[in-house]
Structures are given as C-alpha cells and as structure tokens.
Amino acid sequence: MLKSYPFIGLMGYAAGENPLSYPEVKYAMVLQLINAAAKLVDFVILDCSSNMANVFTPAAIEAGDLVIRILMPDLKGVNYLKAHQPLLVDGRFHYNEHLSLAGMARPFHALDEMGYIIGGWDGLLPYGKEIDRCATEGGMFQAIKYCNSRYTASLSKVLKALEQPEENEGSEEEEESADE
C-alpha cells in the first residue's frame, strides 16, 4: 500500500530482487494470481516487460480486459513490436483490441510513418522533462500536473476504454433480467 494513496496496492520485486530470486513460476500460477487479484479490487494494473518469454507478459495479456501497449515511436520500438507480433496472433491475446500509445514521443519522431507501420496510434504520450523528473524522483502520482493536452487526451481515452467493459456488463445483466 502507498502511504499517500491507501487505495492503491503495488506488487513487484523489492530492492535487490530479480526473477532469479524466486522459484520458477508457471503460466497457470500467474493466471491464478491475476484472477485472485481481480476478485479483491476493481482494477488490476500489470506493468509488464515486452518480453513474451517472461511468463507474466503473455499471462497478463491473456487475462487483461484492456491491454495498453506503449511503444517508443521509433524504428527500434516498432520493429520490436513487429518481431513479437507473430507470438500475439493467438486469439486468446486479442491483439487487435490493444490500445497502442506512442510513449516518450518527441517532435523529431516520425509519428505518422511509425503509426502507419503498426496500424495507427490510439494516443500520444509526449515526452516531458517534468514527467521524467517525477519518475526519477519516485513521484509519478505528481506527474499529472505536468501533462500537456495531448497526454491527458490519451489518458482520457484509456479511462473511457476502462469504463466500456463495466457498461457492457451492465447491459448484459439487464438483458438477462428481461429474459426472465
């Protein structure tokens, strides 16, 4: 739990830990962990590596109601995605439903060209020195004060996408009640 935000819980490696600090984790165990967490809280946010060989990444993508992919909008970021795309075509990963955001975007990035290669951007998270400083200082919850309008528009799109599954659940429940 975070002292300043007691409604937010975090889980991850402690200082000095790494994947080798623990016994090997199986895919099914990760899915169980995600499902257990989902029963405890309204939202489970999993910040995963983009490495599909890491057992948490494919499990999180499979279990996620909303998958947000943040790419550097340069050849390295786009080529990395294209190299992993064949691993994500399995229907359980719902690849075409992911939101793709251009992260750390700077004016010199060829956003249109990179977006064309991946099928378009759903949002833009421009680089900001102030945001970078908040991350370095461990104050990411303060960073929202420094986000420009393009950044906040992308965040709003994510929030709207998060609300959609709840709206769909409500309409499904109404349909079931009407059928009875």
List the predicted regions and their residue ranges.
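P-loop/Walker-type NTP enzyme "switch/lid" segment
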Residues: 1-39, 134-137
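Inter-motif core of Ras-like GTPase G domains
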Residues: 55-74
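NTP-binding/hydrolysis catalytic cores, primarily Walker-type P-loop NTPases
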Residues: 137-180
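Glycine-rich phosphate-binding loop used to anchor ATP phosphates in small-molecule kinases
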Residues: 40-51
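Well-ordered beta-strand positions
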Residues: 43, 66, 120-123
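Conserved beta-strand segments of the P-loop GTPase G domain that flank and frequently precede/overlap
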Residues: 12-13, 45-47, 68-73, 99-104
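P-loop/Walker A phosphate-binding loop and immediately adjacent motor/lid segment at beta-alpha junctions
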Residues: 24-31, 82-109, 143-145
